[in-house]
Amino acid sequence: MAQTLDDLIRTSELPVFIDFWADWCGPCKMVAPSVKQLASEFKGRLIVVKVNVDQQPDAAARFQVQGIPALMLFVGGQLKWRTAGAIPYQQMRQEVLKAIG
């Protein structure tokens, strides 16, 4: 998965938003509806990927995820924004808007 994720980030013409999460993570469950809303609002302008760190530990290690939820935004293959912990939808949306203009 890590290599596939790398390929997606590197080759995507659209910004890529990644949510690293786990089933047992309470804050991840709090953020999940916001991530879903983001995917819906920016459909066609943003790729949203959810990565379960328990099922894909190599991807979590590759992207140096130390706390979850970990949210990352890549544009043109470059990391533009990253945060760990639950944040409000409006903050996520603001970061995406900055990236996509």
UniProtKB/Swiss-Prot annotation:
Keywords: Disulfide bond, Electron transport, Redox-active center, Transport. GO terms for cellular component: cytoplasm. The keyword Chloroplast does not apply. Residues 2-101 form the Thioredoxin domain. It comes from the Bacteria. The lineage of its organism: Bacteria, Pseudomonadati, Chlorobiota, Chlorobiia, Chlorobiales. Disulfide bonds join C25-C28. This is Thioredoxin 1. One of its GO terms (molecular function) is protein-disulfide reductase activity. Participates in various redox reactions through the reversible oxidation of its active center dithiol to a disulfide and catalyzes dithiol-disulfide exchange reactions. Pfam families: Thioredoxin. Belongs to the thioredoxin family.
